[in-house]
From Swiss-Prot:
Catalytic residues (positions): K162, E250, C284, E461
Species per Swiss-Prot/TrEMBL record: Rhizobium rhizogenes (strain K84 / ATCC BAA-868)
Residues that, per the record, bind K(+) 2: L244, K454, G457
Binding site for NAD(+): G150, A151, W152, K176, P177, S178, E179, S229, V230, P231, T232, G252, C284, E384
Keyword field: Metal-binding, NAD, NADP, Oxidation, Oxidoreductase, Potassium
Family from the record: Belongs to the aldehyde dehydrogenase family.
EC number(s) from the headed UniProt entry: 1.2.1.8
Binding positions for K(+) 1 per the UniProt entry: S26, I27, D93
Protein name (record): Betaine aldehyde dehydrogenase
Biological role: Involved in the biosynthesis of the osmoprotectant glycine betaine. Catalyzes the irreversible oxidation of betaine aldehyde to the corresponding acid.
Enzyme class: oxidoreductase
Length: 487
């Protein structure tokens, strides 16, 4: 098989197999071809991975942050040297076009290793607090063994976004990728060992729904970081609460993108397309509710339709391809069912709406789809679809659109396009979301915090803020004189 790894798991610095685990088939979404066959972790594999992490972590934590950071920066360099190889693997794993993966996937992971490697010492600083004759100081200390649970839309990026801050803070990690995309994280683990990471600090185990609870409920696990759906997040939070584990979650969204009548229409359309069709719409922060001022609606839809229908759908390994398949047959069927709901509930189909006829019948393709005249109560406007389906809604005034944008259980992201920056700042101040863009969309450099509010999760990925979620504050009071006691 064209992408078969040496074994299913990577534990304590080497590949490990246990064929007693449930078979996981890795399928290339463009053709339906099985490209690798792996096995889910058995309870014994889970124990082996956590034991390796627990054993390796204390010595790693005793190293200076600068020394830890140096290893991560080496890993970043190796990832960049192998960007083509890693990008092709990511395309096989996910079906995303190579023109995307080569600029956005391993590259983003390398950025994460480089950023956290570079700020290792400064980012973990404590504080000095004078108290008259006495004083106190604080320091950030690692949590111990951390578990990362990844999603299937950006497998290599997520493996790095969780691994980099965890490692630089002095922790060890056991990472479980999605069973839909099991391959990329294994390569990240290999590269970390090559860069000099001591064995046992970054372990990758495959798994299904049975594996997650084994990791989350393990008494030696101190923290769980999940990227996934809201229903999965609720289950993980409930399980972790039993042992009061640290938890961060980056979950789903149904984010608003607001286009005012003074916006640059072409730029706003570009933002809306990036926020709906990039990675075939499989991005948690997508602005899938596009609110367009009624005054410019007709022109907006005219230009949007032309640009959407001009997108090239095809072989993900062809560098000209702009739209690849969905990650799986099940995801394609889910998206197609939402498209049918949109039609049935009275939305106007502007573009797309089905399976393209220019691609392999075995691939999991869906046309980039635009609905107009969408109302707030329609299913496609309220539920996360996680596919290339854009909903365009009309609005008339600022107060109205803010209220409607906030009328959702989600709070991951949002965006505003307008030439009036005063209005832009006023609006984003009132939007209930964790990550917002003005005259841009879906840009997430590692230097800035990324995360949501409401049902879209808590905690932040990236930036200095991420280190707070992989460490805890220790306070030390120092008495400088004799103790005065009343007895």
């Amino acid at each position: 098989m064209r992408a078969q790894p040496k074994a299913s798991h990577f534990i304590d610095g080497e590949y490990v197999e246990d064929t007693d685990g449930t078979v996981i088939e890795s399928i290339y979404p463009a053709t339906g071809e099985v490209i690798a066959r792996l096995h889910a972790a058995t309870p014994a594999i889970v124990e082996q991975a956590i034991a390796a992490a627990k054993r390796a972590q204390p010595e790693w934590a005793a190293m200076s942050p600068t020394a830890r950071g140096r290893i991560l920066k080496r890993a970043a360099d190796i990832m960049r040297e192998r960007n083509r190889e890693l990008s092709e693997l990511e395309t096989l794993d996910t079906g995303k076009p190579i023109q995307e993966t080569i600029v956005a996937d391993p590259t983003s992971g390398a950025d994460s290793f480089e950023f956290f490697g570079g700020i290792a010492a400064a980012g973990l600083n404590g504080s000095y607090i004078p108290l008259g004759g006495d004083f106190a100081y604080t320091k950030r200390v690692p949590l111990g063994v951390c578990v990362g649970i990844g999603a299937w839309n950006y497998p290599q990026q997520i493996a790095c976004w969780k691994g980099a801050p965890a490692l630089v803070a002095g922790n060890a990690m056991v990472f479980k990728p999605s069973e839909n995309t099991p391959l990329g994280a294994l390569k990240i683990a290999e590269i970390l060992i090559e860069a000099g990471l001591p064995k046992g600090l970054y372990n990758v185990i495959q798994g299904d729904r049975e594996t997650g609870p084994l990791l989350i409920n393990h008494p030696d696990v101190a923290k769980v970081s999940l990227t996934g759906s809201v229903p999965t997040g609720r289950k993980v939070a409930a399980a972790a609460a039993g042992s009061l584990k640290h938890v961060t979650m980056e979950l789903g969204g149904k984010s608003p993108l607001i286009v005012f009548d003074d916006a640059d229409i072409d730029s706003a359309i570009g933002g809306a397309m990036l926020g709906n069709f990039y990675s075939t719409g499989q991005v948690c922060s997508n602005g899938t509710r596009v609110f367009v001022n009624r005054k410019i609606k007709a022109e907006f839809l005219k230009r949007l339709k032309a640009r959407t229908e001009a997108m090239l759908i095809g072989d993900p390994m062809d560098e000209a391809t702009q739209v690849g398949p969905m990650v799986s047959w099940a995801q394609r069927e889910k998206v197609l069912s939402y498209i049918e709901k949109g039609k049935a509930e009275g939305a106007t189909l502007v573009a797309g709406g089905g399976i393209p006829n220019n691609v392999s019948g075995e691939g999991y393709y869906v046309q980039p789809t635009v609905f107009a005249d969408v109302t707030d109560d329609m299913t496609i406007a309220r539920e996360e679809i996680f596919g290339p389906v854009m909903c365009v809604l009309d609005f008339d005034d600022e107060a109205e659109v803010i209220a409607r944008a906030n009328d959702t259980e989600f709070g991951l992201s949002g965006g505003v396009f307008t030439a009036d920056l005063t209005r832009a700042h006023r609006v984003v101040d009132q939007l209930e979301a964790g990550t917002l863009w003005i005259n841009a969309y879906n840009l997430a450099p590692v230097e800035i915090p990324f995360g949501g509010s409401k049902q879209s999760g808590f905690g932040r990925e990236n930036s200095l803020a991420a280190l707070e979620h992989y460490s805890e504050l220790k306070t030390v009071y120092v008495g400088m004189g004799p103790v005065q006691a009343p007895y």
